[in-house]
Regions:
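A glycine/threonine-rich phosphate-anchoring loop and its flanking beta-alpha core
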Residues: 15, 113-202
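Buried hydrophobic packing segments
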Residues: 84, 111-115, 185, 247, ...
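Solvent-exposed alpha-helices and their adjacent loops that cap or buttress functional pockets
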Residues: 31, 92-94, 117-118, 146-147, ...
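Short glycine/serine/threonine-rich phosphate/pyrophosphate-binding segments
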Residues: 106-113, 134-135, 246
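Active-site segments that bind and position negatively charged phosphate/pyrophosphate groups
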Residues: 198-305
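C-terminal charged capping/lid subdomain of soluble metabolic enzymes
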Residues: 183-185, 278-352
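ATP/NTP phosphate-donor binding region
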Residues: 1-97
Length: 352
């Protein structure tokens, strides 16, 4: 078993091994006293893995209740969040009980925010079942829901007590969800690991799941350990997300998160080339690897619409934005720019 220890406001382990889902209760019991467990999942994942997770938790002595919601970013809203809170209250969950997020990034964000705020905080465990969640969103403690004005506008930092990652669950991933995870993985290689970029170029992610998850989680461990609350170094994880979130919002979330991040990375790198921050070769190699993994690199949404979406980005502070910009494969810099300058950056990135 691969175990990565995360040092944050709450310390915990990320466990990675084929077959761990059936040991979820046993592993959870090592960090959380048996009581009640609330499985929060979307209807797609629950149909695949709900019964096995219940069985594993009950075997370890947990009394299990389940809450499911329709799959997709459209459910990550205040209404579903309130439904989870009502569910916890109706079943008389206490602060000593645990919410188990079974699913991808939407499930983890929503379940984590509910766990963070129900009775001012209760137990929280992550069982990621998508590649994106396994390598990124299940680790680091960011939880949130979307508002009509923008993505992840209401949320909190709330670390889990454990992350249990069974790569076997990735075998049922739809191809588009696999690609989404690959976008985040490529992001990690771009922001700080050139050797990893070469590995991804030569060997498909699906042929090295455990290794890829371990590398990404170790990188995130180091970043979160230095900057848990996103005030400095952790901002580098936003590579591709500034323009990506705008594209995602303009699509009304019909575009998946990883696809939007891929477009965001391509856009900011084009702009970096035009501004002399990085070379043409870096852009060419990034576009090549994104296309190898079947990811988009351009958007047809107009500049005005994307710029309007940028204006509600939660990363804006004091009229400024910290934009993460590639300098070369495995190295980025942070450009602090006025919000109005985002329009010029998008134009330089090929958006019209």
């Amino acid at each position: 078993m691969r175990s990565i220890h995360i040092k944050a406001s709450r310390e915990y382990d990320v466990l990675v091994e084929h077959g761990l889902l059936d040991r979820a209760g046993e592993l959870l019991r090592e960090v959380s006293a048996p009581g009640m467990a609330a499985i929060v999942s979307d209807d797609t994942v629950y149909a695949l893995y709900g019964e096995r997770t219940i069985k594993a938790l009950e075997k370890a002595g947990y009394r299990v209740h389940s809450f499911t919601f329709p799959a997709g970013e459209g459910s990550k809203n205040l209404s579903t969040y309130a439904d989870v809170l009502h569910f916890l209250g109706e079943h008389r969950f206490s602060r000593s009980d645990v919410v188990v997020a079974l699913g991808g990034g939407v499930v983890g964000d929503l379940a984590g925010f509910a766990a963070a705020t129900y009775q001012r905080g209760m137990g929280f465990a992550q069982i990621p079942t998508t590649l994106l969640a396994a390598v990124d969103s299940s680790v680091g403690g960011k939880t949130a829901v979307d508002l009509p004005t923008g993505k992840n506008q209401a949320g909190s930092f709330y670390q889990p007590c454990i992350v249990i990652c069974d790569p076997n669950t990735l075998e049922t991933l739809p191809e588009e969800q696999y690609r989404c995870g690959c976008a985040e993985i490529i992001k990690y290689s771009m922001l700080g690991n050139a050797a990893f970029f070469e590995e991804l170029y030569k060997t498909p992610v699906r042929e090295q799941y455990e290794h890829v998850i371990e590398v990404c989680v170790q990188m995130k461990r180091d970043i979160v350990g230095a900057d848990e609350y996103d005030l400095g170094r952790r901002r580098t994880l936003n590579l591709g997300h500034t323009f990506g979130h705008a594209v995602e919002q303009c699509s009304d979330f019909s575009l998946l998160h990883g696809e939007a991040v891929a477009i965001g990375m391509a856009t900011v790198t084009r702009a970096a080339v035009k501004r002399g921050i990085c070379g043409e070769e870096t852009l060419a190699r990034l576009l090549d690897i994104l296309r190898r993994y079947g990811l988009p690199t351009e958007t047809g949404y107009p500049l005005d619409k994307l710029y309007e979406a940028e204006l509600v980005d939660k990363k804006i502070s004091g009229g400024k934005m910290h934009l993460i910009v590639p300098e070369k494969i495995g190295q980025v810099c942070m450009e602090t720019i006025p919000v109005e300058a985002l329009r010029d950056w998008m134009q330089d990135g090929g958006i019209r």
